[in-house]
Amino acid sequence: MESTKIAPSFDRASELKAFDETKTGVKGLVDSGISKIPRIFHHSSVELANPKPLPSDLLHLKTIPTIDLGGRDFQDAIKHKNAIEGIKEAAAKWGFFQVINHGVSLELLEKMKDGVRDFHEQPPEVRKDLYSRDFGRKFIYLSNFDLYTAAAANWRDTFYCYMAPDPPEPQDLPEICRDVMMEYSKQVMILGEFLFELLSEALGLNPNHLKDMECLKGLRMLCHYFPPCPEPDLTFGTSKHSDGSFLTVLLPDNIEGLQVCREGYWFDVPHVPGALIINIGDLLQLITNDKFISLKHRVLANRATRARVSVACFFHTHVKPNPRVYGPIKELVSEENPPKYRETTIRDYATYFNGKGLGGTSALLDFKV
């Protein structure tokens, strides 16, 4: 009688713990020479699917717009107006756009990416000393912040730090990327102020309106490392999610992988040399009462032969307890367009967002009126 093969049991909790305790992340798995990814990284076929081809009424949608910021110095009123109109349309329809001539030097962009790569490619014993899930630390290096709560892990490692309003002391940051993190975050804060002015004008408000609401007071920098994946069709670099920030400034690699979901279809975001990718976060959708939208996005697993890196800078208010509540801006609501969201503190929203983890439904749904 032919024997029946029994599939080996899968103890997910034990495998997650074993992976986490290596303290070397996905990079450690790749360095070990694996040819198949562990089951904890397997995502469902439903999540991995991408409906194609596009229906005829969406064929005109190529990808997210690219907007020229004129070196952040609009001497020409027409160019200024065009930038505002471009941002208004992109923020309302895509929630994403790329910016060129943004005032951050190409040299600094490359140095920042090199710093991320240099950190993650240090010897494992160096990285192990910094690996932690103590989210109270100034600097955190780990793999998958939601490792124990997500349905499946993502094929990436990350380090992050809050750079504003209370920047870390130099000794709090790894020497290998310290200087470039400090300089890049300063430049992103300057760019962020300019972007929030344009976004305010796009809403028909005073240029300082969003700044006065402290939308750009806090800045959190996440530096992702996506090693080559031996089975990229089974997992993600980052699973689908929207950002729980007001605004995100993303420094991408020239290895593509970012996709944005619009009307149920995933659109590739092409590499534009020297560009930064800007996207609307949940909190900006909330306070603009859906005038600007925060779309879900994801990163495909890396098919290249070298690692992909990216740097995401999230504009919040700040992480310290703050009684200030945020709801739809009063100038943007009326009897015909009543508030769609209830008021919340940033801390309450962040607690819910982080507890929910990536994937699934938008955290905004829980704050609907």
Swiss-Prot record:
Binding site for Fe cation: 241, 243, 297
Cofactor(s) this protein requires: Fe cation
GO biological process: biosynthetic process
Alphabetically ordered keywords of this record: Iron, Metal-binding, Oxidoreductase
PROSITE patterns: FE2OG_OXY
GO molecular function: dioxygenase activity; metal ion binding
Gene3D superfamilies reported in the protein's UniProt record: B-lactam Antibiotic, Isopenicillin N Synthase, Chain
Domain (Fe2OG dioxygenase): residue spans on this chain: 217-318
UniProt cross-references to InterPro entries, sorted A to Z: DIOX_N, IPNS-like_FE2OG_OXY, IPNS-like_sf, Oxoglu/Fe-dep_dioxygenase_dom
Keyword Hydrolase: no
Family: Belongs to the iron/ascorbate-dependent oxidoreductase family.
The protein's name: 1-aminocyclopropane-1-carboxylate oxidase homolog 2
Organism: Arabidopsis thaliana (Mouse-ear cress)
